[in-house]
Amino acid sequence: IQRCGRPIVLSLSPGPALIEHAWHYEKYANMWRITDDFWDHWDLLKDMFHRCELWQNHVSEGCWPDCDMLPLGTLGKGFGEERTTRFTAEEQKTMMTLWCIFGSPMMLGAELTLLDQETLALLTNREVLHLLNSDCHARQIRLDDDCAVWAARDAKTGDVYAALFNLSDETATVSVQLEELTETFGLSENDGDSTVSVTLHDLWSGCDTNTTGTTLSSELITHACVIWKILRH
């Protein structure tokens, strides 16, 4: 590879990679699978939150732990069982949000000629895809059986993001304290002040919501998520 005379990305599929060998993958490869084959089953997607937390400190320029291909759109043609993804619309959005905020390589495991407009829109949301930028650094700051919370910061612009995920099987309210974001990346010294006012820019809907207080929260249906860019007033 070093003698080929041109840049090459080396992608490994040890499936799943062992975290204790992280140094080896970072030194000798660019991408490496952190999971077995990933398919459109909710239990596999829910488990990916644990895997991403395990590997989140090993994402950097030229080093990308790989969550595997995105099972969206029409699948299974190569296996003789062509079908539409089993993921619900909300689960698809949750998967895209996690892959992007974590910084996974983005590869689509679908029949491209059969992509519908909804799937295409999901795959081409520029604001969500911006999180893949090497200047964005993310951490999972909470994970339990019912919810997950990720925070990210763009080192170049200073923009801070929060992603809330409902991992439970019923509608639930997921919350994060501004103080948690402050401790992770730093917004400002007075983020814990109850008078703090912010605008939450929803990356998926494009809608803005003004809020005041110390807690950000959203009521989410089962397996749904929301991701905001937090704009200070």
Predicted regions located by residue number:
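Alpha-helix-loop-beta-strand connector modules within alpha/beta enzyme cores
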Residues: 1-4
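Hydrophobic, well-ordered secondary-structure elements that form the walls
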Residues: 162, 200, 223
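Membrane-interfacial catalytic/cofactor-binding modules of polytopic membrane enzymes
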Residues: 72, 119, 123-160
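C-terminal beta-strand-rich structural cap/linker in extracellular carbohydrate-active enzymes
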Residues: 210-233
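Carbohydrate-binding surface patches
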Residues: 93, 99-102, 107-109, 143-187
